[in-house]
């Protein structure tokens, strides 16, 4: 356990940051799942509304991943990998080459 005041503060800060990062990562996972679900919905029933759902959820997911990378919650390669996987799935769902 920490003995001095500054070490105790650092422990508190590390715990606070851990919880914030955990929340951020959870939100990234949730938006990724939502994007993939919307892609599946579009595959089953291709129409303009479902296309808009896919596009908006894709933009939100990419935006949040970029913000997580900027805040050092995710490593830049990890963020790029996540975006690549999502984009690959979306392109196959929308039949884009």
From Swiss-Prot:
Keywords: Ribonucleoprotein, Ribosomal protein, RNA-binding, rRNA-binding. InterPro entries: Ribosomal_bS20, Ribosomal_bS20_sf. One of its GO terms (biological process) is translation. It comes from the Bacteria. Pfam families: Ribosomal_S20p. GO terms for molecular function: small ribosomal subunit rRNA binding; structural constituent of ribosome. GO terms for cellular component: cytosol; small ribosomal subunit. HAMAP family: Ribosomal_bS20 (MF_00500). Binds directly to 16S ribosomal RNA. Belongs to the bacterial ribosomal protein bS20 family. This is Small ribosomal subunit protein bS20.
């Amino acid at each position: 356990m920490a003995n001095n005041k500054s070490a105790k503060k650092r422990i508190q800060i590390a715990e606070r940051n851990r919880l914030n990062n955990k929340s951020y990562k959870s939100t990234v996972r949730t938006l990724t799942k939502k994007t993939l679900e919307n892609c599946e919905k579009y595959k089953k029933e291709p129409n303009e509304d479902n296309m808009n759902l896919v596009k908006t959820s894709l933009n939100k997911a990419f935006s949040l991943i970029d913000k997580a990378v900027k805040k050092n919650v995710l490593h830049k390669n990890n963020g790029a990998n996540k975006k690549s996987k999502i984009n690959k799935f979306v392109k196959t769902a929308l039949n884009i080459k």
